[in-house]
Design a protein with these regions (language model features):
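P-loop (Walker A) phosphate-binding loop of NTP-binding proteins
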Residues: 18
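Conserved substrate/cofactor phosphate-moiety recognition/catalytic segment
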Residues: 32-71, 95-99
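Conserved lysine of the Walker
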Residues: 23
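NTP-dependent small-molecule kinase module
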Residues: 151-223
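Phosphate-binding P-loop
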Residues: 2-10
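Hydrophobic anchor at the beta1->P-loop junction of P-loop NTPases
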Residues: 15
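A glycine- and Lys/Arg-enriched "phosphate-lid" helix/loop adjacent to the NTP-binding pocket
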Residues: 96-175
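Hydrophobic positions on the alpha1 helix immediately C-terminal to the Walker A/P-loop
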Residues: 26, 30
Length: 223
């Protein structure tokens, strides 16, 4: 568990990564180990998500606006409280919107509207006393691992069986993540391989993962 010094140092950590990579599992573990609050992406109460998978051209823009609003609220609360872990954040939102534009699910006009709204939100975030996370953790895994995780968690609308268009969406999204991570510059960042450090099937990896995260936080505080 966290020592007294750790408790005195508030921290905000955001996770990022492909659908199905394991963000919620890592978020729960990190929050538990650090004694912080976990913020999870809403799935079960999302009124649009399953509709998007059924008809992405009809619902992609609405879904991204829905997520943007929710994540804007979450990031403001998290930056205000400054002692928490988020399993996804506003910093990734534009990636999903851009991929949907590339696939023709979101028009260029709607993409411009979205980007303008996002820019306004980021400007407001920049005016807050705490402007960015202390650390972003990008979870990486092979595409086969991603598909295995999606299949295992069993959400019917996420399954690629007999749905080549959904598989293409996953493949395109997956292909864009490495550059997104390279371009991310709002805060210190690290990459953790879920293939190497699987904490679900191998809980003994938790301590090594926390060592990596703790070292990254300490290094970030020096700079």
């Amino acid at each position: 568990m966290m020592n007294k010094k750790g408790r005195e140092q508030d921290k905000m950590i955001v996770l990022a990564g492909m659908i199905g990579v394991g963000k919620s599992s890592f978020t729960e573990m990190i929050a538990r180990k650090l004694g912080t609050e976990a913020f999870y992406e809403e799935v079960d109460n999302n009124p649009i998500l399953d509709k998007f998978y059924e008809d992405p051209k009809r619902w992609a823009f609405s879904l991204q606006i829905y997520f943007l609003n929710k994540r804007f609220r979450s990031i403001k609360q998290a930056l205000h409280d400054a002692n928490n872990v988020l399993d996804r954040s506003i910093y990734e939102d534009a990636l999903f919107t851009r991929v949907n534009n590339m696939q023709g699910n979101i028009s260029d006009v709607d993409l411009d509207i979205y980007n303008d709204l996002l820019a306004n939100m980021m400007q407001e975030i920049d005016s807050l006393p705490k402007k960015a996370p202390d650390l972003l953790i990008y979870l990486d895994a092979s595409f086969d691992t991603i598909l295995a995780h999606i299949k295992k968690r069993g959400r019917s609308y996420e399954q690629v069986d007999n749905d080549p268009e959904l598989l293409e969406y996953y493949e395109l999204l997956y292909s864009q993540y490495e550059k997104w991570y390279e371009d991310y510059n709002y805060s210190p960042k690290i990459k953790i391989s879920v293939d190497e450090y699987d904490i679900v099937e191998n809980p003994e990896n938790e301590e090594k993962v926390m060592e990596i995260i703790t070292n990254a936080l300490e290094e970030a505080r020096k700079n």
